[in-house]
Amino acid sequence: MTATLHVIFGPSGAGKTTYAHAFARREKAVAFILDDWMARMFGPDMPDPIEYDWMIERVQRCEAQIWSVVAGCLAAGTSVILDIGLMRRADRDRVREIAAATELPLQFHFVTASAEARRARVAERNVVKGENFAIEVTPELFDFIEGVYETPGPGELDGAIISESA
């Protein structure tokens, strides 16, 4: 079986991390969750309130390391599933370009839910701090992320696996 690069994207609070963990268990793939890496590596040093430039610099560092480890997994024949944000179409296009340049089998997974359900889920996650909690997403941060997120454009979901959570 050929190792495949599975990539999740969707708006904040849609259930992407839950989906990634379930997929990894079911398909015996390795999940790379950017929020987990950020929390473990930089959580103790995180400024309060979070500063955008501080965050972006560390996201880029984490992504570079994640891609390095992903390459090793794929070369060893192990499929991976990435949950690394990909909030903008340009970010998703960059993943397509990387996969094409390295001839990696690529499968996108689009996970979505209504804005009301996502906002409620994030608020609950902030209180419960369960398995999928990495950092607190305040209502202000949620609104900021909503403003950054770009819904899939024409043709972007062609061939994607679509999951709508309640």
Regions found by a protein language model. Give the residues of each.
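Conserved beta-strand scaffold positions in the cores of enzyme catalytic domains, especially
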Residues: A29-A31, L106-F108, L157-S163
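Hydrophobic anchor at the beta1->P-loop junction of P-loop NTPases
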Residues: I8
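Glycine-rich phosphate-binding loop used to anchor ATP phosphates in small-molecule kinases
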Residues: E57-L106
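A glycine- and Lys/Arg-enriched "phosphate-lid" helix/loop adjacent to the NTP-binding pocket
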Residues: A100-E150
